[in-house]
Amino acid sequence: MTINTKNIVVVGAGVFGVSVANHLYRELGGTYAIKLVTASNYVYFLPSAVRLTVSKDYTKSILPLKNVLDSGIEVIKDTAASFDDKEVVLGSDRAIKFDILVLATGSKWADPIGSTYTFGDNYKEYFEREASRISDADHILFLGGGFVNCELAGELLFKYLEEIRSGKKRISIIHNSDKLLPDSGLYNDTLRKNVTDYLSKNGITLYLNTVGASLDTSPKRIFLGEGSSKYIDADLIYRGVGISPNVPVNSISDLCDKKGFIQVEKNFRVKAVEAGNVFAIGDVTNFRYHGLVKRDNWVDVLTRNVISSLQEGTEASLVDADCLETGHAPSGVSLGPNAGFGQFPLPLLGTINIPSFLISRAKSKNLFSDKMEPLFKK
């Protein structure tokens, strides 16, 4: 009989958390106890979540956790309230000691996307409420024209096209650059211009090179710049300016960068933890790129590095992941089920632009929902 005397704790049940837990269990399950901390009995697939604002087909974005998690992994339904380099304290005040900790806590996505931290098991109630708010609103305003808000606007444009054209329903975006999508170097100007032009030409009102400001006394009024007298009123305002990393409370000095992301090496080891037994992966890290393009490489590298750390400690020779430190990222922006634009960087040739019909076929139609289960499970 094997006695599990050592704990590997994974916090977060997104694609990376579940995948890493599965891989570690398959490699180490006979020797180590693999524990997964999650706030929900379900997993939530963010790439297809934008369509839940206009559709109730939850099966394309939500799955029971048990369907994608190896059965030998211990599920702890709770939240991580705090942690140090020895233990995680849960929301229930239970403390779990660990030999290795993997933080895959992701980001806190604003409404109407949310997360399992937001809605737990009550996803139907959450999305039905958001869909109702959207349906009832005459003017919907997005603060920030990043990737998710552009895709949300595309979904609403498809759903409410006739109402938008008639002026019965208005959708606006305030963005701090001259083109939509982040001016971060991940997206080329052609992709950004294509997305901007498509939304603008189809009735979405854009306020570019502008930062929205609000007052507590007028929550439905957004001023077009700090100190500006110009403003717009909207009965539904969604604030989506960048992602907000979901980092549990801790007292570890210099754990996060100025934006709140956990600082990690390219091997996923957390820089601020001298013991070398804490790793982080996914949206919670300070990697330049956040997404699933490198999912297979990242999961394999982290699994290998955790095993090396268990065997050799701080002296372990860890391998680096391909983290897209420079250049453009392979990207497809869906703008409803029948529209979208994309780009793909090629060695020596540079970044090529992917025709809209190919993005529509490859991504927009199903938003990768057909790949959801394997991305968690494999």
Curated annotation (Swiss-Prot):
This is Apoptosis-inducing factor 1. One of its GO terms (cellular component) is cytoplasm. Its cofactor is FAD. It is an enzyme of class 1 (oxidoreductase). Keywords: Apoptosis, FAD, Flavoprotein, Membrane, Mitochondrion, Mitochondrion outer membrane, Nucleus, Oxidoreductase, Transmembrane, Transmembrane helix. Belongs to the FAD-dependent oxidoreductase family. FAD binds at G12, A13, G14, V15, F16, R51, K56, D283. It is a single-pass membrane protein. It is found in: Mitochondrion outer membrane; Nucleus. Its EC number is 1.-.-.-. The keyword Ligase does not apply. The chain crosses the membrane at residues 7-25. Present with 1560 molecules/cell in log phase SD medium. One of its GO terms (molecular function) is electron-transferring-flavoprotein dehydrogenase activity. It comes from Saccharomyces cerevisiae (strain ATCC 204508 / S288c). InterPro entries: FAD/NAD-bd_sf (IPR036188), FAD/NAD-binding_dom (IPR023753). One of its GO terms (biological process) is response to singlet oxygen. Putative FAD-dependent oxidoreductase involved in the resistance to cercosporin and other singlet oxygen-generating photosensitizers. Translocates from mitochondria to the nucleus under apoptotic conditions, where it degrades DNA and induces apoptosis.
